[in-house]
Amino acid sequence: MNHQDRRGLPFKGEGAPKHWALMKWAYVLISLPILGMYRVEAMNEDNIPDGPCILAGNHVSYMDAAVLWSMMPKGPLHFVAKEELYKSKFLAWALDNLGVLPVSRGTADRTMISRCKALLQAGDRVAIFPEGTRGRERENLDELGQAQNGAAFLAQHAKVPIIPVGIEGTEKIMPKGAKFPRFPKVVVNFGHPISADDFEGSRREKLDALTRETMKEIVALRDTARVEIEKRKGRA
């Protein structure tokens, strides 16, 4: 089965994952050890609406998606992942059945956009890392990579808000040179909803402004999460 054929498997009708039971069991199997071993804490989770939204966060570790997923008991959360991950047959099967959406990076992936829009219209949530790839290779992890407009474009077309998310601590789980994982404190900080309608100008100007504001909020939320971790260390 080729990549294009696999892209439709996670969905029934307007976007339901193929196996809800598998998703629920995966949530339990992934979230319990993550919440236990890595001492994950959520800040301001009340900012997450009950309805559809796009979560947009910084990306410095392969654990970012798993940590964010473990924080979302309210309902399904679907991630957008680079299509290169689908080269592995087992990983492709797992991602398909968990409702993950492959995206062709560097292109206007209309298939991914239509699938995401269907999920959002069905009331689900979608998570996107605007940087497009992990920032682990950057010299300075404090600097976020160049943001893509995908999250803002989707929010604009689906008429849903973006929830900026600052993730801090995941980069310490498996730092460069480490042979074994570590178990740091991880904080996930959720920001207030941002909408394209919050800005003035043309459609394009609103799109760019939404992307800039989202990235600005992600940095601020991550920095606040970092301060919280340092406070906890001081009280330990």
Where do the protein language model's features map onto the residues?
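A secondary-structure boundary/capping signal
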Residues: 44, 58, 81-82, 99, ...
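Catalytic core of membrane glycerolipid acyltransferases/transacylases, capturing the structured
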Residues: 49-107
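Short, basic, glycine/proline-bearing loop/turn elements
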Residues: 29-30, 97-103, 133-138
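Non-catalytic C-terminal accessory region of glycerolipid acyltransferases
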Residues: 1-18, 111-236
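A transmembrane-helix-recognition feature enriched in membrane-embedded lipid enzymes
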Residues: 2-47, 89-98
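Flexible, charged surface loops at secondary-structure boundaries
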Residues: 47-50, 121
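A generic structural signal for well-ordered alpha-helical segments
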Residues: 33-35, 72, 94-95, 119, ...
